[in-house]
Regions:
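Conserved C-terminal portion of the radical SAM core fold
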Residues: 3-6, 326-336, 361-363, 384-390, ...
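Radical SAM [4Fe-4S] cluster-binding motif and immediate context
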Residues: 254-420, 432-433
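Short capping segments at the starts of secondary-structure elements
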Residues: 572-581
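Short amphipathic alpha-helical interaction segments
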Residues: 591-604
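A short, conserved structural fragment
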Residues: 606-617
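Short, amphipathic alpha-helical interaction segments positioned at domain boundaries
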Residues: 617-653, 664-667, 671-673, 679
Length: 679
């Protein structure tokens, strides 16, 4: 059996597809004699475009990150709908004010070129006479994958086309199968069990037992063990009727999660133009689901879809998997896809990674209430980049989200990440039902005090996502949902079908007023501009604490705390405290601790930008002095570095990128002086 698995744009060009790596490994385990090839069509697209037109990393990166606007998927809409000028005017009108004209013009050019690329890649896939062609589709891959599946079917009608991935979960998968007849099968849910079962059914569909029947995806094998017995599968019966089997009600146990097989991806990346743009990363998973979401599903989050149940791999097995992949592919940068850190890994997985002796550089998603020593443990294990789900700094808004943290805890994370030298990524989210301008005014007032801490990437209005509580429970505030407007420019489908197919939904704007929103965005923009030039640190010398400040919003530069009460209060403010608890603890050791003095001290420190207050609590914002200048990434300059490999970029195997195209280099500098690209 010949199987081709396809990773279409706009997936990341610095990492292989975890989903396809897992499926390849699983298929080879079940069918050792099968031929399983992965087509890295995202890399092929980069090379194809640089050969046919000017194309830069910034342009690919912009498209890959524009899922919420529909910019990237519209590029493949002409190929999907087989109409060369599909909704060009409508696209310009809907997105023109949001996108700079050069990027808008590039999108129109790519839109015109997309049908040619789709034909080329489909012809190449079909030339290998595959029995099965599988497409993974997550976020902005849908239009490109569907367009290519249509083209593959025209070149090789005998091949069975199969879709899977996050865009196929639940009703989305059934709608995709129902509306696109060139898609023979859709695997909904976790594919490790379902996909091999489908291959078995196809393989037994003809006399010699070697080839699948492919074609229409119809079958009369609807008895026990046939297509009707495969959980979550969408298929067509002998009369052409779409059938959606009930999905599995229990997720796979952690022992069933296999190690991905990435084959020749890293060699292919090195030969691609993308190899001169970004360093590659290994992708792994230690867990699936979300243990916090099992207890308190964050109101806006649609991740995990049908399976929220948290499952994590045995820590030693996970460590062995990471180190095995690192040793095999000779790459130290690792991207962990877990939605949340298994807290047990802090005392199991993390110490074992540290003991490995490798200078690993891992990216991990964590809950934002981790403390400094826990961050140190992760940092020592090589986890230097975190996505922390900070989302907001107002306790009241965080409570509306059901995040399970406070504003002061989030500020503590920003402060302590600066102390231990961890880089982090977060967005400031707004637009929650029940929030008010007052929830943002106090934060905007205090923003200059935080300019030395990692700023949010942006201030972003939430979109309602399928599977989120906001989607499932209209009583929470979003009671008039409709498919996001940009989908109408991509798919030629009625609203009722889009409502089943898509992941994002439009709603009326809720929450903050326009004037407050303008203030928030100005505060975030000012924070981002100031961050690279601002420092605030403290050094605890035992009997005194010295603070050094370079933030332009404050007039002081050096503060020497020598008063025993002030030293004690500052140390207490390492953790969030209410004024009452501060007074109680300080008074237990210092007779001069009075309510008036504590109040005066907190007011003075807030005026100096030393203390952040929210929700009746306060916390100091000064990281421990630890050579922060050596441990920061200058994100504003990542796209202006020299090419990683100019000779490689110009090699015959990989068409040269235009000499004017800036190419990013990300360098992490550790406290010990080691460096390494993180891509």
């Amino acid at each position: 059996m010949r199987i081709v698995l396809v990773d279409m744009p706009w997936s990341a060009i610095d990492a292989p597809s975890l989903a396809l790596g897992i499926l390849k490994r699983r298929v080879l385990d079940v069918f050792p004699n099968a031929s399983v090839d992965v087509v890295h069509a995202n890399l092929d697209y980069v090379d194809w475009l640089t050969a046919h037109t000017g194309f830069t990393f910034e342009e690919y990166d912009f498209c890959a990150s524009s899922y919420f606007s529909g910019h990237s998927e519209w590029i493949f809409s002409a190929a999907l709908n087989e109409q060369p000028h599909w909704n060009v005017r409508e696209f310009n009108e809907s997105i023109g004010e949001k996108v700079p004209e050069p990027l808008l013009a590039k999108a129109r050019e790519l839109h015109e070129l997309a049908p040619r690329f789709v034909r080329d890649i489909a012809a190449r896939i079909a030339a290998g006479a595959p029995d099965v062609v599988g497409f993974t589709t997550t976020f902005a891959q849908n239009a490109a994958a569907l367009a290519t599946a249509r083209a593959v079917k025209s070149f090789a009608p005998y091949a069975a086309t199969v879709f899977g991935g996050a865009n196929c979960d639940g009703p989305q998968g059934a709608a995709l199968h129902r509306n696109f007849p060139f898609v023979d099968f859709v695997v909904r849910g976790e594919g490790e069990a379902t996909f091999p079962q489908l291959l078995t059914a196809l393989r037994h569909g003809d006399g010699d037992g070697d080839e699948g029947d492919g074609g229409s995806g119809s079958s009369d094998r609807d008895g026990e063990g046939g297509l009707s017995g495969i959980s979550g599968l969408c298929w067509r019966d002998s009369g052409g009727r779409c059938v959606a089997n009930p999905m599995e009600d229990k997720p796979l146990p952690p022992g069933a999660l296999v190690t991905p097989e990435y084959g020749d991806y890293f060699d292919r990346h090195a030969r691609s133009t993308a190899g001169s743009w970004v360093e590659p990363r290994i992708v792994v998973e230690g867990s699936r689901g979300c243990w916090w979401g099992e207890k308190h599903h964050c109101a806006f989050c649609g991740l995990n879809g049908s399976f929220m149940e948290f499952r994590s791999k045995n820590p030693q097995r996970f460590v062995d998997e990471i180190l095995g992949l690192v040793e095999r592919y000779r790459i130290l940068d690792v991207w962990v896809t877990d939605n949340i850190l298994d807290m047990a890994y802090l005392t199991s997985m993390a110490p074992r990674l540290q003991e490995s002796g490798y200078d690993l550089r891992l990216c991990y998603e964590i809950k934002s209430n981790l403390r400094r020593e826990q961050l140190r443990t992760l940092s020592a294990a090589g986890i230097g980049y975190i996505q922390a789900g900070v989302e907001n700094l107002s306790s009241r808004v965080l409570q509306l989200m059901d995040k399970g943290v406070t504003g002061c805890q989030n500020v503590r994370l920003l402060r302590d990440a600066e102390t231990v030298g961890m880089n982090l990524n977060w967005n400031y989210l707004y637009g929650f039902p029940g929030e008010s301008d007052e929830d943002y005014d106090a934060i905007c007032d205090q923003a200059p005090a935080l300019h030395h801490l990692t700023p949010p990437f942006n201030a972003t209005r939430i979109k309602v996502e399928r599977f989120s509580p906001y989607f499932d429970q209209p009583e929470l505030g979003f009671d008039e949902l409709r498919p996001a407007a940009h989908y109408r420019h991509i798919y030629d489908l009625p609203e009722s079908e889009l409502a089943e197919l898509v992941y994002l939904f439009d709603s009326r704007d809720l929450g903050v007023s326009p004037s407050c929103l303008d203030r928030l965005k100005r505060a975030v923009s000012g924070w981002k501009d100031a961050y690279l030039h601002c420092r605030l640190t403290h050094c605890d010398l035992g009997d005194r604490i010295v603070l050094v400040d370079t933030r332009p919003g404050f007039v002081w530069r050096l503060l020497d705390l020598t008063d025993p009460l002030e030293v004690a209060v500052f140390r207490l403010l390492d953790m969030p405290h209410s004024p009452a608890s501060l007074l109680r603890k300080a008074a237990a050791r210092h007779e001069d601790a009075t309510e008036e003095r504590i109040t005066e001290l907190l007011d003075r420190w807030r005026h100096m930008g030393i203390v952040f207050t929210d929700g009746g609590q306060c916390i100091h914002v000064a990281p421990v002095a630890a050579n922060q200048d050596l441990m920061r990434l200058d994100g504003s300059r990542l796209h202006s570095a020299e090419p990683l490999a100019p000779a490689l970029a110009a090699s015959p195997a990989a068409p040269a990128a235009p000499t004017s195209a800036p190419t990013p280099v990300t360098v992490t500098v550790t406290a010990t002086g080691g460096t390494g690209g993180t891509g």
